[in-house]
Amino acid sequence: MDKKYDITAVLNEDSSMTAISDQFQITLDARPKHTAKGFGPLAALLSGLAACELATANLMAPAKMITINKLLMNVTGSRSTNPTDGYFGLREINLHWEIHSPNSETEIKEFIDFVSKRCPAHNTLQGVSQLKINVNVTLVH
């Protein structure tokens, strides 16, 4: 079964954007931080990646016998604002997981690898670009 996604984005008079999906909406804004009304588009993309990774981990943990007491993720990305090769996209994404769990380090690392392969956002970004995605895990017992 194919899952479909439908998002409508509207440019507002103040140059912010409103994205609408189902009954939800989010304000995005590419202007400088001191005037912005929401995340920039790339920050929203990275937030979506983090949310997908966390949701996938939460869903898959019971089946993999992983106990999650607390789960956090920090995502950073980098791109050139004046590229010599004409590529303006993200060149690297770093995912830092912090997992509070009694499971072993080996179990957690295998689980995160499993999650990354099943997260649709991670798969999409990894599969269609030359983007390097680094994954780092901190286990807290």
Swiss-Prot record:
Coiled-coil zones: none
- Enzyme Commission designation: 1.11.1.-
Sorted UniProt keywords: Cytoplasm, Oxidoreductase, Peroxidase
Q: Where in the cell is it found?
A: Cytoplasm
Query: What GO CC terms are in its UniProt record?
Result: cytoplasm
GO terms for molecular function, please? Answer: peroxidase activity
| EC class (word) | oxidoreductase
Instruction: Give the quaternary structure.
Output: Homodimer.
Tell me the function of this protein: Reduces organic and inorganic peroxide substrates. Protects the cell against oxidative stress.
Family under the similarity heading: Belongs to the OsmC/Ohr family.
Q: What is this protein called?
A: Hydroperoxide reductase
Give the organism, scientific name. Answer: Mycoplasma pneumoniae (strain ATCC 29342 / M129 / Subtype 1) (Mycoplasmoides pneumoniae)
